[in-house]
């Protein structure tokens, strides 16, 4: 398909029609709920991950997923097209992002190439086997089709395998998928299968966040730290291809969802203490972003060692640790003698080392999978948003 004037016209029309539900979409799971109730969510049933959108939004997202004839095991909606971010006007309607976990990538692309050949760039000419190889052997194990029309929406969807999803969530092989799923997402299909694996990922993100923070911190500090992890090796942040205030915008607009995800984990974390009284927690609305909860964590050799023991395998390796108690204890003792800024810098550099190469190769792969013109449109939109955010509208 030629991405010319006709497509630009239809794209603008779709952006306008999409805003009818985008401007109204909201989430219902916080109705008549307090922060105190969020703390008591059942982590064994993954209650903290079950974010339920309003029916109108859920129907629209589900309609997109059901459009595809190729079988999808797990479907995830994420990003600013699903969750509003601060800094967007009501006239702006971001592209809707999806991740599709599939059982057999070759079979999936074969069916999808027959149904949606226009979604693919010139690589479709080499067949589903080549597409699948490009997906799994280069970058982050995800193949994206971007700026395509599905059921009246402009979407981007990434296709990945079960193996790549689970390895990244548990071990942070590239942290590409894990980083996205550390933020609020909507699971449209395959909930229980996904939640179990992502629980490891959320705990890992929390442990990293605590290691990078001082003994006293606010929940806003914690959520910003967690969100920033996936952007540490992202070259787009260096070249203004992302909003420089993106992290703050995500947290401030989605505070209720971050509280739902992480407050029960904090509540169950040994050595972390809520400073606010129980009366405050019982009266506080999860959506209230006019104030943030404060915490105190015990920073001792034992507490640091325990947090290190909860890190994913690949980060442990990059930190130069062996997965045994004595190695964690030695590192904890060293971290304890250094300032918090030194400890935070060490972890930041390690995560950047973990993510930067895979993000770079994924970006290069995107030029081929999206095609030159679609890639230009995508990068232009990112640059425009990033530069406008830096210098003002």
Swiss-Prot record:
One Gene Ontology CC term in the entry: mitochondrial matrix
Its topology with respect to the membrane?
A: Peripheral membrane protein
Query: What's a single GO BP term from this record?
Result: cardiolipin biosynthetic process
Q: Which reaction does it catalyse?
A: a 1,2-diacyl-sn-glycero-3-phosphate + CTP + H(+) = a CDP-1,2-diacyl-sn-glycerol + diphosphate
Instruction: List the Pfam families.
Output: Tam41_Mmp37 (PF09139)
| Keyword terms of this UniProt record | Lipid biosynthesis, Lipid metabolism, Magnesium, Membrane, Mitochondrion, Mitochondrion inner membrane, Nucleotidyltransferase, Phospholipid biosynthesis, Phospholipid metabolism, Transferase
Which cofactor does this sequence's record say it needs?
Answer: Mg(2+)
Q: Which GO terms describe its molecular function?
A: cardiolipin binding; phosphatidate cytidylyltransferase activity; phosphatidic acid binding
Q: According to its UniProt record, where is this protein located? A: Mitochondrion inner membrane
Coarse class of the protein's main subcellular location: mitochondrion
What Enzyme Commission number(s) apply to this enzyme?
2.7.7.41
**What pathway or pathways are given for this protein in its record?**
Phospholipid metabolism; CDP-diacylglycerol biosynthesis; CDP-diacylglycerol from sn-glycerol 3-phosphate: step 3/3
Q: Which domain of life is it from?
A: Eukaryota
Q: Which family does it belong to?
A: Belongs to the TAM41 family.
Task: Quote the function comment for this protein.
Answer: Catalyzes the formation of CDP-diacylglycerol (CDP-DAG) from phosphatidic acid (PA) in the mitochondrial inner membrane. Required for the biosynthesis of the dimeric phospholipid cardiolipin, which stabilizes supercomplexes of the mitochondrial respiratory chain in the mitochondrial inner membrane.
Q: Which PANTHER family match?
A: PHOSPHATIDATE CYTIDYLYLTRANSFERASE, MITOCHONDRIAL
Name of the molecule in the record: Phosphatidate cytidylyltransferase, mitochondrial
**Gene name linked to the record:** tam41
